[in-house]
Amino acid sequence: MWRIKIAEGGNNPYIYSTNNFQGRQIWVFDPNAGTPEEQAEVEEARQNFWKNRFQVKPNSDLLWQLQFLREKNFKQKIPKVKVEDGEEITSEIAAAALRRSVHLFSALQASDGHWCAENGGLLFFLPPLVFAVYITGHLNTVFSPEHRKEILRYIYCHQNEDGGWGIHIEGHSTMFCTVLNYICMRILGEARDGGIENACERGRKWILDHGGATGISSWGKTWLSILGVYEWDGTNPMPPEFWAFPSSFPLHPAKMFCYCRITYMPMSYLYGKRFVGPITPLILQIREEIYNEPYNKIKWNSVRHLCAKEDNYFPHPTIQKLLWDALYTFSEPLFSRWPFNKLREKALKITMDHIHYEDHNSRYITIGCVEKPLCMLACWIEDPHGEAFKKHLARIADYIWVGEDGIKMQSFGSQTWDTSLALQALIASDLSHEIGPTLKQGHVFTKNSQATENPSGDFRKMFRHISKGAWTFSDKDQGWQVSDCTAESLKCCLLFSMMPPEIVGEKMEPEKVYDSVNVILSLQSQNGGFTAWEPARAGSWMEWLNPVEFMEDLVVEHEYVECTSSAIQALVLFKKLYPRHRNKEIENCIINAAQFIENIQEPDGSWYGNWGICFSYGTWFALKGLAAAGRTYENCSAIRKGVDFLLKSQRDDGGWAESYLSCPKKVYVPFEGNRSNLVQTAWAMMGLIYGGQAKRDPMPLHRAAKLLINSQTDLGDFPQQELTGAFMRNCMLHYALFRNTFPIWALAEYRRHVLFPSAGFGFGFTNNL
């Protein structure tokens, strides 16, 4: 039986931590764990998911929840409530519904104070990790038979009815993910026509019917070349020499978005080495299975730019293709010959130095799941028996997640982000007298998860930004500062500082608060908006270089409405509590940030959400940020337009439901069907509350609250529905905790501001700056 372990490093000499592994969550298989009843409960969850996999594609993340509730012997004691048609929602009904969810949510807190959750749903995350451990000869040591069984379960569960796999679990089939998952099944032991319901045969048929694997997108071409089932001559150049150029060079990686930079760092190393893994009998078989012509007859140079239409969300512009052609024709032959091959050797060393630096400063977690197997493989190529590779192996467990739909690879964990939102939802409930220990533990976790140092050495030379005082998206060890994670965690600490210490613990030291504010301020751009990870270092013109066909806006850092809103909220509250610290600078920062939010509003009154689906998410953040900055419905046309957008998109059942297609299409697309999405309903509901809807006409809020209350389960949680997370326009994420966090938060705000409208928003002040 699978069990999750919290804040454990084990006895592995190759793993280390900056904060005693707080926030770390790893899964282990214990064949002796669980009673027959508990094992049956898990199996029932698996079977229920399988039967309904085409209706609700994200899993409910039940395995760890079943474990926690058993360990804490949680029983729901508060009776379920229901609002009948024509019935008024009383404070007693709202309080009962809220208390049911809050008590359950508190029982789901981990022992170190954070909340666990899956953060995944992308179907290109896991196969490269399997490829990497296969190439290095560690497949059987990293993945036990139980691991392999659950990985295959996940692949089977998320195969589309047409036989292919999408970029994400709700997406249409693509060549990229179908080829990757087909090969993954073969490596894990399935025969060419094997798998549940002939998964391999159906997957291969999809590949061949859509032109074969030569049409795989660029990341796929890279991984297939590494694996030995494609040729490097069929990929566009990724010269490591770019890392050897002065950072003033217009196309230097230092100017790129951190994820783009650190993905292409090991890719360029592998490309420069022309590395190919062992050509095993299985690799030779796969070569003959995924193409429509014999492998040795393929003209690799002619397929460099080929991309299946299903994958080609961001077609390469002609000027980009000309650049790749020039590099392929002129520079690559040059760097393979003396004396220029000496320059390549130097560039490879510089690139490897950067890989080691990033590995060290993330405790070998790396910045994310795309980069992890690439960096690990580069370290193995340099020294198969070296410490760096062994440290990478020790951190694979940080990425593995087990649900009722099988084993998947996390993006890299959302522990800090999820916890900061969960704590704010619980604080808003005004039930601190009932859940004091939960709040205290969460407060301790948040304080202990703050970064206390910048990256090591001359970090600016390594193109890194300050991190001292920041919070990451996952845990402290991962090390990468994020503006909104910092702002939301700082808000938690500031809110706790206003509460009785005997309930929530001692407040954070002022110097650490100042460090956090310093990080937030450092990430504001000249246009007033806030970036996520690093300051914007280049203009948007560089996006024409985007080599990734299925994503957009990933070459350089951009400003985001969500990050800007979070920063405003944190700084407004900080300014109230610490009015003398950088007062004028913070005041100007808030003014410019609020203006940025107004400036990027869509003509229909909405805001595009970058990290959630989509206009519902962005509009909630925008309205909350503007309200924090002192804007009101009466004095701000942007708020009036935003409120109007939300009211117009409310559905007959009182809720909201937006399709994930809004993200790639960049226009509001309603969800097909009659059912509303409860998480999006919570976002819209809170957006209306911050827009002052309660005092004008509370009926839309009553209708939304009725839907949330009546959707609550017998246990006290809320049902899993469609995906709600997003990134890079075309990739959707499963934030499994959101199904509880946001309905709780919305009901809490409804109870405070609609049923008891005298309550303030908690921003510190609401007058105009």
Curated annotation (Swiss-Prot):
Expressed in stems and laves of glaucous individuals. Not expressed neither in stems or leaves of the glossy phenotype, nor in roots of both phenotypes. SUPFAM superfamilies: Terpenoid cyclases/Protein prenyltransferases. Its EC number is 5.4.99.41. It comes from the Eukaryota. Signal peptide: none annotated. GO terms for molecular function: lupeol synthase activity. PFTB repeats lie at residues 148-189, 513-558, 590-630, 639-680. The active site is at D484. InterPro entries: SQ_cyclase_C, SQ_cyclase_N, Squalene_cyclase, Terpene_synthase_CS, Terpenoid_cyclase/PrenylTrfase. It catalyses: (S)-2,3-epoxysqualene = lupeol. Keywords: Isomerase, Repeat. GO terms for biological process: cuticle development; pentacyclic triterpenoid biosynthetic process. One of its GO terms (cellular component) is lipid droplet. CDD domains: SQCY_1. PANTHER family: TERPENE CYCLASE/MUTASE FAMILY MEMBER (PTHR11764), TERPENE CYCLASE_MUTASE FAMILY MEMBER (PTHR11764:SF48). NCBIfam families: squalene_cyclas (TIGR01787). Oxidosqualene cyclase involved in the biosynthesis of the cuticular lupeol of glaucous individuals, but not of the glossy phenotype. Lupeol forms probably the thread-shaped epicuticular wax crystals that hamper insect adhesion and can prevent herbivores from climbing vertical plant structures, a phenomenon known as the 'greasy pole syndrome'. Belongs to the terpene cyclase/mutase family. This is Lupeol synthase. It comes from Ricinus communis.
